[in-house]
Amino acid sequence: MHERLTVENGLKELDVATKEFVTLFRHGTLEVELYRPRRVDRQQPHRRDEVYVVVSGSGTFFNGGRRQPFGPGEVLFAPAGAEHRFEDFTDDFVTWVFFYGPDGGEAPA
């Protein structure tokens, strides 16, 4: 585990890694990342469910054929296998990403 799970520490690691995301924590099926795409979000559907918690910035979230605006502090969910991406986002966009559960996602409650 990293020293502290903070946005500041995650951004420092992103700068060093020169990547759009960095994994900061893993436990069981839980994986915590910080994600900072540049200009275009190129992610593809994932095998597991994921939750985003927007740290900064705003834009549009495309998820399973639907679009919705997003902003700081917002929580977004993308089920396993769903086509999703961030669109028209501001230059300061950063989000926490929480992957969890089994491949294929969890069954709806």
Question: Residue locations for each model-derived region?
Answer:
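A short, N-terminal "cap"/entry segment at the start of jelly-roll beta-barrel domains
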Residues: 1-34, 39-44
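Short histidine-centered beta-strand/loop micro-motifs
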Residues: 22-24, 40-46, 63, 87-88, ...
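Short, charged/polar surface micro-motifs in flexible loops or helix N-caps
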Residues: 28-30, 37-40, 58-60, 101-105
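A structure-centric signal for secondary-structure junctions around beta-strands
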Residues: 29, 48, 92-93
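Short hydrophobic/aromatic-rich beta-strand segments that constitute the beta-sheet cores
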Residues: 32-34, 61-63, 95
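Short, conserved beta-strand element in jelly-roll/cupin
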Residues: 46-61
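Short acidic-glycine-tyrosine-enriched beta hairpin
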Residues: 65-80
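Ligand-binding loop in jelly-roll beta-barrel domains
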Residues: 80-106
